[in-house]
């Protein structure tokens, strides 16, 4: 279940949308390459978009919204690509990292009644209930040292671009 609410705008103050669970199919594909004698492994994976169609229950100020005929809300979760690697280095050291891209730029949620309110207020389709402005990039790079079979120290650097302000 997904529940979304607003509080910031007078028109949509106390607006709530409830999306019941649904099921949809997507796919995942990947390739991996390794050189065991160097403890080297790299992999790339792709996760497809997944299209959902669900009937949202919408309300405002605690009352059900029924401005327009109910239609299914189409939601498409984003595709993504991941690249991961790790390799052993001399003297019990280990280097690892990853790079991830997610296509959030095409992700939006626009329930039927929410869109009808926008139309009635003369706002057209100027904005969606949820909408990201850009794609997300994230990366991680780490270094680890094994002191003994029980003790390992690791240092990691992370960066994430974010996906914009929904």
Residue map of PLM features:
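Outer-membrane beta-barrel porins/channels
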Residues: 1-166
């Amino acid at each position: 279940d997904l529940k979304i609410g607003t509080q910031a705008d007078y028109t949509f103050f106390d607006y709530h949308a409830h999306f019941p669970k649904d099921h949809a199919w997507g796919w995942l594909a990947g390739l991996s390459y390794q050189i065991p004698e160097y403890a080297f492994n790299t992999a790339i994976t792709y996760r497809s978009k997944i299209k959902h169609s669900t009937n949202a229950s919408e309300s405002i100020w605690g009352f059900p919204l029924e401005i327009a005929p109910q239609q299914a809300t189409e939601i498409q979760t984003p595709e993504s690509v991941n690249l991961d690697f790790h390799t052993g280095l001399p003297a019990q050291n280990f280097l690892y990292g990853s790079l991830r891209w997610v296509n959030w730029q095409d992700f939006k949620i626009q329930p039927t009644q929410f869109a009808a309110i926008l139309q009635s207020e003369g706002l057209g389709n100027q904005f969606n209930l949820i909408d990201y402005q850009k794609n997300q990039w994230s990366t991680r790079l780490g270094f680890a040292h094994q002191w003994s079979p029980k003790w390992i120290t690791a240092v990691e650097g992370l960066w994430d671009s974010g996906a914009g302000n929904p």
